[in-house]
Regions:
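Short glycine/proline- and aromatic-enriched beta-strand/turn motifs that initiate or cap beta-hairpins
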Residues: 9-53, 169, 231
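Transmembrane beta-barrel architecture of outer-membrane proteins
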Residues: 43-49, 63-65, 104-110, 125-127, ...
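Predominantly the C-terminal beta-signal and adjacent terminal strand-loop region
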Residues: 12, 16, 173, 178-234
Length: 234
């Protein structure tokens, strides 16, 4: 019976108390899942901000942490305006191929579980991040080379265009994010990371009731990022 406390202690893993902070930056590739469908290419945009991570435990070979970030992110969509023959749609007024894209800026706040395997404080480890993410709308900007009233509707294979004149209606975004990455730690120099992350939006940017035009309008975002962290408590 006297051995039970020692067995229990071994089962819960080795406690950690490491707090790391730093910065991150990268590039977003985003589409919006519109229903009815809007044909798009991925829209690029900046992503970057601040990272905080608290390492709580090492359980066997798994290093367990919680990680939070506050990031500025450019999302949106870029329309692929084509004919039924997959050719660019030429505007009758301007004589050039029609182009339209929308940039929507957010402050994004992910809260994630961070699980890593490998070297903890010197060398490389591989990690996964996963958890909820919340987005707070800052503003939006449209880039277009044609007037909406003068768009070439006759030649478009995809006739859905209501989104071109609609501002974002729902200013709070939320969803699930997950990523895979690698970290390299150098004592007294810091921790260097590279990560690929995916965000699936569960909220819509437009109303989605039966009376609304779009049934869905949620984000899907691939992010490639790098980060630098340093320990302030160990």
């Amino acid at each position: 019976m006297m051995t039970l406390p020692f067995v229990a202690k071994g089962q819960i893993g080795d406690h950690r108390n490491t707090l790391s902070i730093g910065v991150n930056g990268g590039y977003n590739l985003t589409t919006v899942r519109f229903t009815p469908k809007v044909v798009q290419n991925m829209k690029g945009g900046f992503a970057g901000g601040f990272t905080m991570r608290y390492t709580v435990e090492k359980y066997f070979s798994t290093i367990a942490s919680v990680q939070g970030e506050v990031n500025f992110a450019q999302l949106g969509w870029k329309e692929d305006i084509r004919t039924i023959d997959n050719q660019p749609v030429i505007n009758a007024i301007t004589g050039v191929a029609e182009k339209y894209e929308r940039t929507i800026n957010y402050v994004q706040v992910p809260f994630m579980a961070h699980l890593a395997w490998g070297r903890e404080n010197k060398g490389a480890n591989f990690f996964v991040n996963a958890g909820p993410q919340f987005g707070f709308y800052l503003g939006e900007k449209t880039s277009s080379n044609f007037e909406f009233a003068n768009r070439n509707t006759a030649d478009r294979a995809n006739s859905v265009a209501a989104q071109d004149t609609m501002s974002v209606q729902k200013k709070f975004d939320y969803g699930i994010t997950a990523g895979l990455g690698m970290e390299y730690a150098i004592p007294r120099a810091g921790r260097f990371q590279v990560e690929a992350r995916y965000y699936y939006g569960l909220g819509n940017i437009y109303g989605d009731s039966k009376k609304d035009y779009f049934g869905s309008s949620n984000f899907g975002t691939i992010t490639i990022k790098i980060a630098y962290l340093f320990d302030i408590m160990h």
